[in-house]
Every structure is written in C-alpha cells, then in structure tokens.
Amino acid sequence: MELNKTLSLLGACLMAFSACNTSHNSSDDNFNDTVASALAGGGNIALDQMQWTREPMAYSISGDSLSITTAAHTDLWQRTYYHFRNDNAPVFQMQTDEQYFSFVVKTDFSQSHRRFDQCGVVMYLDSDNWLKASVEYENEEFQHLGSVVTNNGYSDWATTAIPADVKTMWYRFSRRADDYCIECSRDGSNFSQMRICHIPAAAGRISFGVYACSPEESSFTALFTDFSISECMWKAHDGQQPDEE
C-alpha cells in the first residue's frame, strides 16, 4: 500500500514537472527578439513588438510615436540616501538576447513642470537591477540631465545641470555583453557619453526601452519618437591594455 502511494506521488510530481517544462519551452518558442528583427529589417522598431512592464495612466501609439501620460507619485529608486523603495514607474520595453547593439530614441518633455518630472531610456530587469537616463525637471532655471544605475537593490544618481529651456533630448543606449553605455544628444547626430556601467544581472536576455514618471504631485505627457536599432556604436576599447591576470 505504502509503495503504491509513493509511486502515485512520484508520478504526480513527474507530470507536474513535465507540464512546467512544456510551459517554459512554449514561452521560449514564443519569444520574439525585437533587436534581431530590427537589425534584419533595417533598424526600424515595430512598437507593437514592445510590451508594458507597467502601464501608465494613459498612453497613445501612432506609427513610430509613443506618448505616455504619467500619474502622480510614480518613480524608480531603491534605498540609497532617501531610504525609500519606489518601483511603480510605467516602463515600455522590448526583449533581446543580442549581446552587441545600440538603441536610439528621441524624447520630448516640453510639458514637464513639477520637480522630478522625467522621461528617458531604461533597462528594467527587476526591482533591484535596472538603469535609466533622463532629464528631470527641477525649476524654471535648470533641470537635471542624469542617469541612475541600480545593482542588487541600491541606486546611485549621477547628474549635471542643464538649462530649463531644453525640451528635447536624444539618447543612445549601447550594449557590449554585460557592459553598457548611455549617451545623449541635442540633435540626434552628435552624442556625448553620460555613463559606462556594468550590471552583473544583465548578462543574458535583457528588457529595455523607455519610461516616464512623476514622483511628486504631478502629471505630464512625454513623447517618444525616432526609435531605432543599429549595430553597436560603442566600439571596443583601443587604448590601455588590460592588466595581466
């Protein structure tokens, strides 16, 4: 009797494992590598291939244009200095296994008006591992052009002040394996480095795209256009040689 019970339980476990494994394989079979598709198609990104990690209060997609209307008290930040853990900003992303590529997008934040209103590029893996780059409104005199990298649940923030009358910004997000570079541009042609970083959790399949949020009592509409993918524009280092192991 006991042997029969044991065999029955073992059979049930094997069936459950098989079902889970089938489901996992099915998910992999349905995976659409947006970067690979874009590279094969001349660099154009079909926005209908991107997905919401979290939806905003309102949004609109028209051709290659996306608008996001933020809700108040939405943000991305983990622990450092402020001690709070904010993890509710709307994020619109694509997935890829590609190890070398660049992603470019133009942002328009002419409607931002309250402190920390922001929009930009993002690579959001989970609550504790992500990066973002954006312009954050401060006041009528200046804004913060900056980037945040979050590893293992702790965020940092690197910024520089820019005039408040800047209302558009291009970003270029580049990947070389698990190293990343973020650049910005006022004209979409001449890019300046903002950040080089390493994210251990981002060595395999990643999700990346755009985001917008309003951490304080505010709401605004951000516009994203000119989405494109290309071969990696962040070239391999050709200066000082690595130290010998």
Residue ranges and their predicted role:
Residues 1-8:
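Bacterial N-terminal signal peptides that target proteins for export
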Residues 11-15:
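Hydrophobic helical h-region of N-terminal Sec-dependent signal peptides
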Residues 17-19:
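C-terminal motif of bacterial Sec signal peptides marking the signal peptidase cleavage site
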Residues 24-245:
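Extracellular glycan-recognition regions
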